[in-house]
From Swiss-Prot:
Protein name per Swiss-Prot or TrEMBL: tRNA dimethylallyltransferase
Binding site for ATP: G14, P15, T16, A17, S18, G19, K20, T21
Record keywords, A-Z: ATP-binding, Magnesium, Nucleotide-binding, Transferase, tRNA processing
Enzyme superclass (EC): transferase
Task performed by this protein: Catalyzes the transfer of a dimethylallyl group onto the adenine at position 37 in tRNAs that read codons beginning with uridine, leading to the formation of N6-(dimethylallyl)adenosine (i(6)A).
UniProt KW Cell division keyword: no
EC numbers for this chain: 2.5.1.75
GO MF annotations in UniProt: ATP binding; tRNA dimethylallyltransferase activity
Site positions (Interaction with substrate tRNA): T105, R127
Family: Belongs to the IPP transferase family.
Length: 310
């Protein structure tokens, strides 16, 4: 919303490893801001190293809301996020402070800005039928089925993503409308004035280097032990959204004996680079966003100036 009478909300978006957390902490020191995490991986407890969750020292300087709110066994939807984020925003604004939303889960930002389309509730019987078909024919065959029904959704959903794939098919079988058709119907928009920023390096190779360096740092910090603790629980599996997070899936496959350690490292870095590429694709089509260069010394100045001049 652009109405100046509405309280301001700052969005600090960007691909993974672009420097969002460091900039957010700097902003908290300069503005009356409270941070709300916009990250589908940081919601999980016990998943700290592989998600690059802010450290205890960083959280002491700048507490983050919506961290550690789910067990890895649980799911969390864009609708859940919107409900939680709106509650946190309302609380922060009521205290006379500015909500600073930080993260790279672009679907969450979209849900918050535009509202959610009226998708049908899950139907256990239809979901069971889809899973039975997958057991018989494989998810690749079901992905081909989705391709013929809803090519836009099929292009966005990987054949190895059974949760999202089955949901897209389920929506069509329940409603007779595709996921793409239904999501074009907007819900209630965000009733705040948003100042939107995206931080990323202009040089793609620099982002790739930052991703590789961070992955190796995670390994040195005990990432394998972190995932092994999850693996040894016995109630988690590779199809859960938590374990499908980049890095976790590849480490899980290594612990499961499916791939070598070196292959795990290679795949983990590649998967993270692919995530960053998807995030950048979202951001390039984003409206009303101000771009910031990773590492630039005046990024906080730009945001502060935008806030006072808006």
């Amino acid at each position: 919303m652009t109405d100046p009478r509405h309280p301001p909300v700052i969005f600090l978006m960007g691909p993974t490893a672009s420097g969002k957390t460091a900039l957010a902490i700097e902003l908290v020191k300069r503005l009356p801001c409270d941070i709300i995490s916009v990250d589908s991986a940081l919601i999980y407890r016990g998943m700290d190293i592989g998600t690059a969750k802010p450290t205890a020292e960083e959280l002491a300087q700048a507490p983050h809301r919506l961290l550690d709110i789910r067990d890895p066994f649980q799911t969390y939807s864009a609708a859940d996020f919107r409900q939680d984020a709106l509650r946190e925003i309302e609380t922060i604004v009521a205290q006379g402070r500015i909500p600073l939303l930080v993260g790279g889960t672009m679907l969450y930002y979209k849900a918050l800005l535009e509202g959610l389309s009226p998708l049908p509730a899950a139907d256990p019987l239809i979901r069971q039928a889809i899973e039975a078909e997958a057991s018989l024919s494989g998810w690749e065959a079901l992905h081909a089925q989705l391709q013929s029904i809803d090519p836009v959704a099929a292009a966005r959903i990987h054949p190895n993503d059974p949760q999202r794939l089955s949901r897209a098919l389920e929506v069509y079988r329940i409603s007779g409308q595709t996921l793409t058709e239904l999501t074009q119907t907007k819900g209630e928009q965000l009733p705040y004035r948003t100042l939107q920023f995206a931080i990323a390096p202009t040089d793609r190779e620099l982002l790739r280097q930052r991703i590789a360096e961070r992955f190796h740092l995670m390994l040195s910090q005990g990432f394998e032990q972190e995932v092994r603790a999850l693996y040894d629980r016995g109630d988690l599996n590779a199809d859960l959204p938590s374990i499908r997070c980049v890095g976790y899936r590849q480490m899980w496959e290594y612990l499961d004996g499916q791939i070598s350690y070196d292959e795990m490292v290679y795949r983990g870095i590649v998967a993270t680079c692919q995530l960053a590429k998807r995030q950048m694709t979202w951001l390039r089509s984003w409206q009303n966003v101000t771009w910031l260069e990773t590492g630039a010394i005046n990024n906080a100045d730009i945001i502060c100036h935008s806030l006072t001049s808006a």
